[in-house]
């Protein structure tokens, strides 16, 4: 186990597991999330299959700081960037231009990507210890209720995902989703 993993509570070998294309279930603000390395197209496709999700929906990224999201974000105006950063860390996800590095599996084939700097300490610590942003989508089969516990994740996905034990936050609803270009609230 690395010093970062032991200090932040990550499971031994988790970073290598994600690099190899593994999918994890981990606690977030309102439920367990499924995640993977956003740079790994095979892992993204695996996650989409696990959920039975429409590949055209895209997925969002979370991180402990904006710097980890930057490789996936395209050009932003200084005003737009400032508006976005004022809302973080917190439960606001912004839809922003995607960089050319952003895999189509992450964007759902769109020119935008959804990003958030999380205020949930365990999720932020996980991103910090792994040194990367993580894909974040609710831990459930598409159309079903998201898992609220590690045990529910294990029952739902078995050995197909590695479960990170922890507590979810106190939010009852998913994050607010806002289009940065238009200011339109896509999900309240």
UniProtKB/Swiss-Prot annotation:
GO MF term set: ATP binding; double-stranded RNA binding; L-threonylcarbamoyladenylate synthase; tRNA binding
Organism: Thiobacillus denitrificans (strain ATCC 25259 / T1)
Catalytic activity: L-threonine + hydrogencarbonate + ATP = L-threonylcarbamoyladenylate + diphosphate + H2O
GO cellular component terms, semicolon-separated: cytoplasm
Subcellular location: Cytoplasm
Gene3D superfamilies assigned to the protein according to its UniProt record, in alphabetical order: DHBP synthase
Primary gene name: tsaC
Pfam families reported in the protein's UniProt record: Sua5_yciO_yrdC
Protein family: Belongs to the SUA5 family. TsaC subfamily.
Protein name: Threonylcarbamoyl-AMP synthase
Role summary: Required for the formation of a threonylcarbamoyl group on adenosine at position 37 (t(6)A37) in tRNAs that read codons beginning with adenine. Catalyzes the conversion of L-threonine, HCO(3)(-)/CO(2) and ATP to give threonylcarbamoyl-AMP (TC-AMP) as the acyladenylate intermediate, with the release of diphosphate.
A single BP term in Gene Ontology: regulation of translational fidelity
Keyword tRNA processing part of the UniProt annotation: yes
Limits of the YrdC-like domain: 8-188
Keyword terms, alphabetized: ATP-binding, Cytoplasm, Nucleotide-binding, Nucleotidyltransferase, Transferase, tRNA processing
PANTHER family on file: SUA5, THREONYLCARBAMOYL-AMP SYNTHASE
Enzyme Commission number, as recorded: 2.7.7.87
InterPro entries for this protein: DHBP_synth_RibB-like_a/b_dom (IPR017945), Sua5-like_dom (IPR006070), TC-AMP_synthase (IPR023535), TC-AMP_synthase_SUA5 (IPR050156)
């Amino acid at each position: 186990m690395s010093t970062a993993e032991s200090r932040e509570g990550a499971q031994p070998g988790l970073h290598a597991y994600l690099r190899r294309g593994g999918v994890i279930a981990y606690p977030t603000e309102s439920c367990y999330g499924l995640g993977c390395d956003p740079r790994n197209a095979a892992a993204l496709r695996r996650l989409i299959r696990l959920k039975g999700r429409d590949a055209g929906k895209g997925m969002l990224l979370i991180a402990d700081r904006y710097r980890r999201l930057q490789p996936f974000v395209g050009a932003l105006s200084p005003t737009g960037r400032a508006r976005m950063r004022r809302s973080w860390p917190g439960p606001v996800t912004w839809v922003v231009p995607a960089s050319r590095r952003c895999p189509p599996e992450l964007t759902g084939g769109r020119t935008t990507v959804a990003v958030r700097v999380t205020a949930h300490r365990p999720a932020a610590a996980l991103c910090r210890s792994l040194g990367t942003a993580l894909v974040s989508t609710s831990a459930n089969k598409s159309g079903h209720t998201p898992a609220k516990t590690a045990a529910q994740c294990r029952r739902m996905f078995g050995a197909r995902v590695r479960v990170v034990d922890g507590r979810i936050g106190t939010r009852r609803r998913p994050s607010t989703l806002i289009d940065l270009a238009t200011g339109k609230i896509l999900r309240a």
